[in-house]
Amino acid sequence: MIITRNWLKKYLNLDNISNDQINMALNSLGFEVDSVYDLNSLNSELILGYVEQSKQIPDTHLKLNQVNIGTKSLQIVCGASNVDANQFVVIAPINATIANGLTLTSKKIQNYESQGMICALNEIGIDLSVINKEDQLKIYNVSDKNLDLKKYIGSDVKQIIGLDDYLFEIDLTLNRSDCLASFQILKELANYFDLKIKNLDNNFSDFKKNNLDLKIDLANQVKDQIKTISYSYFELNNKNDKLDSKDEIFLKLNQINSSNHSITNLSLISTLSTAQTHILIDLDKLKSSNLKLEFINHDNKELLCLTNNNKLVNIIGLDTQNEFNVDNNSKNVLNIMLNIEPNLMRKQQKLLNISNTYLQRYIKPINPNLFNLANQTFSNLLNDYQLINKAYEVKILKQTFKNKQSLEIKLNEINDLLGTNLTIKQIKSLFKHLDFKITNKDDLLDFQIDQNRIDITSKNDLCEEVARLYSYDKIDEIPLSFTSFKKAKNLNLKLENKLTNYLIGLGFNNTKTYSLTSLNEAKYWNLFNISEFINLVSPLSNLRQTYRTNLSKSLIDVAIFNHSINNKELKLFEIADIYDLNNLKQRHLVFLTSNHIYKNSLNQQLIENNFYYNKEILENIFNLYNLDLSEIQYQSDLNLIKEIHPYINTTIYYQNQLIGYLYKLNPKFESENKLNPTFVCEINLDILNQFKNSFIEAKTLSKFQSSSRDLTIEISNDLTYQKVLFNALSDVKYLKSHKIVDLYLDDNLIKNNTKALTIQFVFNDLEHQLTENEINQEFEKIIKNIKQMKVVIR
């Protein structure tokens, strides 16, 4: 971002403020000044000349010119193609040293004495990159609508065209993207030096009602990416087709190659002031009033574009296409103002491989509601050039962003956090010339936030702003003090440590994965119904822009990577937190098994991975938290995510609260990623901590031999195992435990939407050794209860 002293002088009285003081102020306010440039020192002397006569020198491309410099007339030989009589030009006289290092001397060219130089812009310090190719070999013609230049012939031309300026090149931090509007830096400096801003009230005000029925449709893939759509339009008279030299040089100092059309140039000056970009279209060139924002393939790149009847009007971030662009003959000008999701525009910038004034602002988080300020500023500029016949107010087609209106904070909260003793009066004075309004009731301060400061959303942000304006250098450095205290017992942490040790003992590897993922992936794998995603304001990549909503996908990605390097025998787990914008924080556990449960390469012993091995691990975790396993419910309902096996999956509930999921990956997904059979389980540890039984009860162990019976049943996939078990165990005595020991599926069972389960029942008693007759009698009760449910016993 570039700020110039001359631009600041239009709004602030800087008579008693030096460039060094401005430099110090910017750095003190948190804007790092990368470099400064004293343009006035680039050229020792430049004066305004008037070409009275220009004649071609025979047999050459040179012209012999008589140039009036006020006190006398100079004879100057010039080879520029555009030099001609009746032009105001920049003259470097004899003995002057100009920016390219040349010191002028009197010399003969083609036997004609040349007494100085008529200068081109690149010769006096303007970079070639911001000069059109056709203008690079031309001399510069000076113009100013407000000055009678004939009265200034022989005067210092640097003051007339703005080359007496001083530049500050500022590096903005991401949270201060609002300062891509130079008006914001203006307010900061006015506040720092306690200066009143002038000339901002000289506004054009004669806006007519906007009755233009313009439609801008949004393609489905961009509907959620467009925050704001607004437009206005102007009827122009085109009295002037050239910018004043000061404005043209100002654009070039801001690294902008000015257009040949003054209307476009004025919109760029408005963009520098407000940070809102303008898309200008000649209304008379549109085929209809129906526009569309959509992705189209242009030069083999999918770019966000504005179209009209399937014709390309504007590639967002570039100038309007020539067929629809404004020119010096345009009478009706449409002004469209957009605010677009920065991540999308960063992708657009990468595809376009350029950085310009438009894209620099599209890719940053800026107040989406700048349209009225931008339209007002643009109208002021058009009015200064007497170009407006009629101007029409802004009409809003889409507005999704609402500015944070206010924040309340107590005085002691600010002082405690910053280590200061500021008073309410002092704090109010810090914001004197900024667009903050501060009221208080006793020691409670109410801050009405500057709408451009979308980075201020919390009390901590306010405290940081107070510290910045007060100056960090004024805050006393106080070393941290540590108070020792008795550490409270944390049963949840102890259980988590036991859980970690248990999984490590089973051969699992503790894994740490990235907390950030893509927005689409966060939505797609939102297994735990997280409502308000946390998105980074400016992520380095779209792949890492949103806090994850689950741990499962992260561990699956780890498994895919390990399989790609031939590490296929995997047992992984991770314990981490899940967050959302509603202050949600959930502690989750995920574990993953892939390929074999056990593999001994010496004797070729293999135990294949299966659902019930992972379920047993899960139930052992439930036992660790002393949960009542009879309250656990398993339901199969994960068909929405295609990466999960449609049949081998379960959703787990405890007392009707969602605990988590256990599932096998879809074989197609496994095949695509070259994975062996892989099972994943993710649970919410906060629910386990909520329902854990903290009381450990010692139970008497039976001294007698237990006996078991196995039973295989066929049940419908629509019937839950818990329901079958609840009815089967009605009035059954001596039963100590039960568990599923096998699951069987074949084509016929799958066809009939059923499965075969083998359940083991264990019987024992504390008082006596059970006889076979007693055991069989209770086992028959189970069989009878199951038959009453019309469940097939195999």
UniProtKB/Swiss-Prot annotation:
Domain of life according to the entry: Bacteria
Encoding gene per record: pheT
One of the Pfam families matching this protein, by short name: tRNA_bind
Source species of the chain: Mycoplasma mycoides subsp. mycoides SC (strain CCUG 32753 / NCTC 10114 / PG1)
Any one Gene Ontology cellular component term annotated for this protein: phenylalanine-tRNA ligase complex
Enzyme Commission number, as recorded: 6.1.1.20
PROSITE patterns on file: B5, FDX_ACB, TRBD
Record-given protein name: Phenylalanine--tRNA ligase beta subunit
Residue ranges annotated for the tRNA-binding domain, each copy included: 40-158
Oligomeric form and interacting partners: Tetramer of two alpha and two beta subunits.
Binding site for Mg(2+): D455, D461, E464, E465
Gene Ontology BP, a term: phenylalanyl-tRNA aminoacylation
Record-annotated FDX-ACB domain positions: 702-794
Cofactor note as given: Binds 2 magnesium ions per tetramer.
Catalytic activity, reaction form: tRNA(Phe) + L-phenylalanine + ATP = L-phenylalanyl-tRNA(Phe) + AMP + diphosphate + H(+)
Family per record: Belongs to the phenylalanyl-tRNA synthetase beta subunit family. Type 1 subfamily.
Subcellular location: Cytoplasm
Record PANTHER family: PHENYLALANINE--TRNA LIGASE BETA SUBUNIT, PHENYLALANYL-TRNA SYNTHETASE BETA CHAIN AND LEUCINE-RICH REPEAT-CONTAINING PROTEIN 47
